[in-house]
């Protein structure tokens, strides 16, 4: 199923999600309204709330509470973006100035805190202790992942295992929670819950692998941020590690130095040459496709419905995208 058909299938539910997001962002504090609206209207993909919507429908849910789960998932994602951009000193996201560039670091951090706490208010409104447990654990793991990534900055010696732990924690865990919590809310079977959980984990991993790849081979304007940001920030992502381990000794030393020192955007062209020579970008894409295939396989426990087909379609879209 292509994105157009997925959007048609989820149009009513996603309209409810967007309305819930705007309603729950409302505050008596004007700056929260201004910055909150600035970030949520920034043209994000909404893939995480869409997973939540589709997962609930795929196991036969007919109520409306999945809209709340979808909205709070987007809130958690939004709060992490606000904090990430401060940590990374980013100035562009989704083709426009980041919130910290537009409003300042302090406002971004504090509004991020507000959005986190509002997400937990929404969780408690669902009346499901298990959903609260899963989401609380997910947010904790996400925070750990961000700290792990911070520890890995400027470290060219991190292992692939360490890298995969980081992307599971900071990205895939929220995908996993989105699918799992919707299944829990819908009263799905344990087998279906496990299938949804695995789907989210594998899809989130594939999604982040493609994100890391696009940092090196996308068009900056289309990507909506600066190409080579990871290199400039000294982040050792999988494409960079592959090129360092499979390139010439000279290329390996250049990449090692770029990671250690940061501020390496001027080395982007020779780094890309090394990646192309080693097939690093294609290798990373293949790894992402393997994860997407695992995500699709995990859905076999679900009934064969258009909702399941849409989840399968999302897995394909995640690895075929160019932004």
Curated annotation (Swiss-Prot):
GO cellular component, one term: cytosol
Binding of Mg(2+) 2, residues: 84, 88
Binding locations of isopentenyl diphosphate: 45, 48, 77, 94
Lineage summary: Bacteria, Pseudomonadati, Pseudomonadota, Gammaproteobacteria, Enterobacterales
Family statement drawn from the similarity comment of this UniProt entry: Belongs to the FPP/GGPP synthase family.
Keyword Magnesium belongs to the record: yes
Catalytic activity of the protein: 5 isopentenyl diphosphate + (2E,6E)-farnesyl diphosphate = all-trans-octaprenyl diphosphate + 5 diphosphate
Cofactor: Mg(2+)
Pfam families, per the entry: polyprenyl_synt (PF00348)
PANTHER family attached to this UniProt entry: ALL TRANS-POLYPRENYL-DIPHOSPHATE SYNTHASE PDSS1, GERANYLGERANYL PYROPHOSPHATE SYNTHASE
InterPro entries: Isoprenoid_synthase_dom_sf (IPR008949), Polyprenyl_synt (IPR000092), Polyprenyl_synt_CS (IPR033749)
Residues that coordinate or bind an all-trans-polyprenyl diphosphate: 93, 170-171, 208
Function per UniProt: Supplies octaprenyl diphosphate, the precursor for the side chain of the isoprenoid quinones ubiquinone and menaquinone.
Binding locations of Mg(2+) 1: 84, 88
EC class name: transferase
Entry protein name: Octaprenyl diphosphate synthase
């Amino acid at each position: 199923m292509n994105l157009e058909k997925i959007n048609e299938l989820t149009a009513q539910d996603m309209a409810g999600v967007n309305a819930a997001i705007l309603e729950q962002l409302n505050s008596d504090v004007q700056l929260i309204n201004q910055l909150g609206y600035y970030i949520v209207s920034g043209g994000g993909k909404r893939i995480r709330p869409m997973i939540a919507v589709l997962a609930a429908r795929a196991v036969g849910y007919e109520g409306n509470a999945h809209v709340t789960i979808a909205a709070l998932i987007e809130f958690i994602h939004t709060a992490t973006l606000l904090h990430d951009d401060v940590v990374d000193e980013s100035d562009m996201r989704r083709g426009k100035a980041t919130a910290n560039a537009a409003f300042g670091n302090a406002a971004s951090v504090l509004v991020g805190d507000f959005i986190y706490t509002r997400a937990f208010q929404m969780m408690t409104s669902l009346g499901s202790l298990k959903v609260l447990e899963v989401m609380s654990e997910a947010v904790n793991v996400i925070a750990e992942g961000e700290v792990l990534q911070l520890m890995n900055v400027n470290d060219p010696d991190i292992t692939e295992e360490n890298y995969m732990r980081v992307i599971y924690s900071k990205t895939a865990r929220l995908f996993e929670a989105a699918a799992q919590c919707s299944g829990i809310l819908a009263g799905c079977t344990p087998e279906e819950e496990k299938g949804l959980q695995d789907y989210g984990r594998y899809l989130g991993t594939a999604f982040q692998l493609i994100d890391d790849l696009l940092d090196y081979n996308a068009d900056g304007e289309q990507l909506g941020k600066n190409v080579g940001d990871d290199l400039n920030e000294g982040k050792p992502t999988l494409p960079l590690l592959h090129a360092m381990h499979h390139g010439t000794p000279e290329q390996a030393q250049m990449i090692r130095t770029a990671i250690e020192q940061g501020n390496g955007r001027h080395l982007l062209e020779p780094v890309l040459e090394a990646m192309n020579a080693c097939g690093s970008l294609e290798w990373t894409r293949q790894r992402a496709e393997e994860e997407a295939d695992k995500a699709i396989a995990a859905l076999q426990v679900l009934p064969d419905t258009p909702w399941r087909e849409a989840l399968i379609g999302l897995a394909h879209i995640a690895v075929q995208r160019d932004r």
